């Protein structure tokens, strides 16, 4: 399915980590970090957390690109010129996004427990801590697609074939997560359809009541 609007989201019982860039050489990461791309990823993650994971008001932590999140410009300008503006715009759209945080201290202090998801700038920044914590039970989920796609968080591990050493846990969790997301999407679709219409109420009038039943009668 050829869709540019997706997020590689690693999911476990302890954390969810999304990536701005995925399989790129480290030397090319910076040129792919833009305000528009970060904002797009935040929108997708926020929507996915609501419809796929049943989190009503998700909180998303955003990492910086440089060590110490740029250290106020001493170690890079991407945080101030690109990442922070994307976070500000996301907040204007109602997305609870906070940061940018330095990745090392964020995981070291267990701040990840305070957030529903994390947006990392590049592959190893997000996946090394994720796999250290959840290698055998993590799931690779593609957020933003119209269908559910999951896979084990680890690679194929062909060297373990026929050795009776491979763990099925991540594969099993991928199946369970796919079922849970399918169920959550059905529930989200049900509660989101036929929303109440918006009414303009003039607060200067004495009678501010709205005849909801009359509006409903017009719809049938």
Question: What is each residue range found by the language model?
Answer:
Residues 1-78, 84, 88-220:
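Anion-binding alpha/beta catalytic cores of soluble intermediary-metabolism enzymes, centered on
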């Amino acid at each position: 399915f050829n869709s540019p609007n997706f997020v590689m989201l690693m999911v476990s019982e302890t954390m969810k980590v999304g990536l701005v860039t995925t399989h790129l050489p480290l030397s090319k990461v910076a040129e792919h970090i833009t305000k528009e791309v970060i904002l797009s990823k935040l929108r997708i993650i926020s929507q996915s957390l609501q419809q796929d994971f049943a989190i009503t008001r998700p909180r998303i932590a955003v990492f910086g690109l440089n060590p110490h999140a740029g250290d106020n410009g001493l170690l890079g300008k991407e945080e101030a010129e690109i990442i922070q503006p994307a976070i500000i715009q996301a907040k204007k759209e109602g997305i609870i996004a906070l940061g940018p945080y330095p990745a090392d201290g964020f995981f070291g202090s267990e701040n990840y427990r305070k957030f529903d998801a994390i947006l990392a700038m590049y592959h190893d920044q997000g996946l090394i801590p994720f796999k250290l914590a959840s290698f055998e039970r993590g799931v690779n989920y593609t957020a933003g697609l119209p269908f559910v796609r999951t896979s084990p968080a680890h690679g194929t591990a062909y060297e373990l074939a026929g050795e009776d050493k491979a763990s099925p846990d991540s594969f099993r969790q991928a199946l369970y997560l796919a079922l849970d997301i399918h169920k959550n999407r059905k529930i989200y679709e049900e509660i989101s359809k036929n929303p109440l219409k918006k009414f303009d109420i003039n607060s200067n009038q004495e009678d501010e009541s709205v005849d909801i039943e009359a509006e409903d009668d017009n719809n049938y």
